[in-house]
């Protein structure tokens, strides 16, 4: 049986070897997306083992059962030599009873691990399960979520490629449509995005990500700035109307002289019923003189049917909004996969059935050749990779202007490669969301505007221009005096006050 100190030594050795293997794994160059994903999963498995070993080691150092202390006292006491020979005797006795016991050093286990990485088996090359549509982590497969979305009540009917462009624009969906069925759709979409992220980016700490999303969401929810969920104002019955000082009135008849509208406004300010005749309103309002709202008869107050279940509805809305917040974050993380999915679906729709079959056969043969050759792709100019995972031709790279980078401050300093992607992004969700956060409509006036300061100044200029073009009755409305002279409204009013007409 291993001693406590030997267990601690073995755990320390395993931690160091795990750190060494993880460092080598991360430094190894990955030639394909499949290699990158498999490498990340191997690294995560070693990280999990590292955390498990660290936990075991901490428990041994805590020594809650006192065994470590007893062992230290035994080997450091006055009879240390007797303890040494006693343990040596136990070891010899063990090997006498088990003469064929094989002990594999830890170094051999880790060497086998490195060999398995350099020469992976067929099973090791497919560490994660992906659908055919997902292309081993290259594309998203949102067909089930799409079917769920188009079957929602009152949802607009759209095709799959349009859904890929707008499925994260949840802030555009009216609050009235965000019911229990909509919540189930969000849960389904979020579950897929979380599972896909776990498969494609296994090193992403989703617990830490959840805490970050929750903290940001709580802050925005309290401030009423979360997209699609503006802060609800309180009931009109508690804030509408104007209070009236009743100390200046000695009877309800005096109140009646104020008229129906003024009495209604005062009753609304107190949350009381505001209907009835002039006398009834005056009597109802006068009955509150010198009394607190708590002491008034409950029959005097207006019934607000919306107040029932308000707290429950608020909690339900908050749960739905939190699901949306998580979806926004995961879509941001999977932005590259989403863009590639959109292009892949477009390309498939533009091809005939025969061309699609040929493409699938080519992909199968290429994947087989990649597995056989496993060569590192030569890419000295750092060109973008095509749909086949290989660098695109340099002439095509220059033709599309992909060597030119465009930054957009409104999109959070996001970088777009090439003029085509840059021009297209003005109509996409990221730029539209940035403009919405600035409180500016994303119209044609703001095409090619990427700086926040430029957009704000242009919006102020447009508002001034619209204000100057607005019709002004004082100077533009015309009147005719008794002599037949045509003058504007302001001049006419001045002449009328002076009695010159």
Swiss-Prot record:
Residues 343-374 are annotated as: Disordered. The modification Phosphoserine is found at residues 54, 121, 295, 299, 365, 367, 369. This is Splicing factor 3A subunit 3. Ubiquitous. Its main location: nucleus. The lineage of its organism: Eukaryota, Metazoa, Chordata, Craniata, Vertebrata. InterPro entries: Matrin/U1-C_Znf_C2H2, RNA_Proc_DNA_Dmg_Regulator, SDE2/SF3A3_SAP, SF3A3_dom, SF3a60/Prp9_C, SF3a60_bindingd. Component of the 17S U2 SnRNP complex, a ribonucleoprotein complex that contains small nuclear RNA (snRNA) U2 and a number of specific proteins. Part of the SF3A subcomplex of the 17S U2 SnRNP complex which is composed of three subunits; SF3A3/SAP61, SF3A2/SAP62 and SF3A1/SAP114. SF3A associates with the splicing factor SF3B and a 12S RNA unit to form the mature 17S U2 small nuclear ribonucleoprotein complex (17S U2 snRNP). Identified in the spliceosome 'E' complex, a precursor of the spliceosome 'A' complex. Identified in the spliceosome 'A' and 'B' complexes. Residues 355-374 have a biased composition (Acidic residues). GO terms for cellular component: catalytic step 2 spliceosome; nuclear speck; nucleoplasm; nucleus; spliceosomal complex; U2 snRNP; U2-type precatalytic spliceosome; U2-type spliceosomal complex. One of its GO terms (biological process) is RNA splicing, via transesterification reactions. The modification N-acetylmethionine is found at residue 1. Belongs to the SF3A3 family. It is found in: Nucleus speckle; Nucleus. One of its GO terms (molecular function) is RNA binding. Residues 343-354 have a biased composition (Basic and acidic residues). Component of the 17S U2 SnRNP complex of the spliceosome, a large ribonucleoprotein complex that removes introns from transcribed pre-mRNAs. The 17S U2 SnRNP complex (1) directly participates in early spliceosome assembly and (2) mediates recognition of the intron branch site during pre-mRNA splicing by promoting the selection of the pre-mRNA branch-site adenosine, the nucleophile for the first step of splicing. Keywords: Acetylation, Metal-binding, mRNA processing, mRNA splicing, Nucleus, Phosphoprotein, Spliceosome, Zinc, Zinc-finger. The modification Phosphothreonine is found at residue 475. A motif (Nuclear localization signal) lies at residues 175-179. A zinc finger (Matrin-type) spans 406-437. Disulfide bonds: none annotated.
